[in-house]
Amino acid sequence: ELGVLQSLLAYHDAQMDYATQDHNGNGALEYAQRIFSEPGKHDGLYWDDDGDGDVSPLGPLFGQDVVGDAWYGYHFRILDAQGPSAPGGAYSYLIGNQMSRGFAMVAWPAKYDDTGVMSFMISHDGQVFEKDLGPHGDRLAKEMKRFDPDDSWKVVDVAAGD
């Protein structure tokens, strides 16, 4: 599960880096709403090197994966809102169709009790949370609409590696 924690921290850093540039020419700085960019675009955190000198925030290792495949035995999904248990309370990260108010991600085991047990969440605040969603965690994570670490989610000491 250490690889998953490192991946979430890399996601956080990549989002912070991504939001320093206007990638779609609309004059607004925003966070990426996808991990993998559409071909020929820079609308996600990873894109193939197209020779323009603009390096994707996530780098080539993430790009070797196929969308939908497990990474370190986990699935990852970007969330575009947060709930009442999150710092700052409940709100959408979207203003119109731009994710400029924050970001979050959930990661859950591809095969519960085989590739992992714990599920994890991170938001723009950079704090990682964990919870055992149980054998139905795949369904629960896919239904998750917002970053909402209530009391059942525990803070992960990332410096200690879990």
Report each predicted region and the residues it spans.
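Membrane-proximal amphipathic alpha-helices
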Residues: E1-L8
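Extracellular/periplasmic head regions of type IV pilus-like filament subunits
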Residues: Q6, D13-M118, I122, D132-L133
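A short, surface-exposed interaction/processing loop segment used at functional sites
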Residues: M118-W153
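Short, low-complexity, Pro/Ser/Thr/Gly-rich segments in the mature regions of secreted, periplasmic
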Residues: D151-D162
